[in-house]
Amino acid sequence: DCILSDISSVKTGLKEWYDRCGHPYVSTHPMFGPTFANLNQLSEENAIIINEGDYMGRIFFKDLYQRLGLNIYEYSFEEHDKTVAYSLSIPFVSTFVFAAVMKHQDAPGTTFKRHMRIAKGGLNEDDYLLQEILYNPYTYDQVAQIRTELKELMQIIDDKDAVGMKAYLTKIRN
């Protein structure tokens, strides 16, 4: 006997696959990777355990993740993919857009340097991982929200609308 386990970033279709395979399973997702995580300070990192599947498998990973000091959250397969679309797709897409339009700066400011460091780290992620995250069925709506916000911000800039800019900044700061 065995328990199947995955740590995939997108869970779409896994529940159905697990149900067909006939083996007990456990599905988790450590929400950090080697690019940005401080592996010496895992108490600042999160892990998701899917609340479906084999009970003992879930207990095993809950114990393991607790011993590592991770913050543990339990979601369904669908809740997980919605969370990942929000928490991973938005940052990756924003980073891609930044990287696509940036050019070398001889005297970059602090904000530019920080964004550049994040962009380089994000672009060093595995291509398949990035593709998997962006092909999450819930990603499109998140990217559409970015487009909507950009359109609103561009209109404020085009109009040089100080009142609109103040309202926009108030909205995003709260």
What do these predicted ranges mean?
Residues 2:
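Hydrophobic "anchor" residues on beta-strands that sit immediately upstream
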Residues 74-174:
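An accessory alpha-helical subdomain
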Residues 5, 10-72:
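Rossmann-fold dinucleotide-binding core
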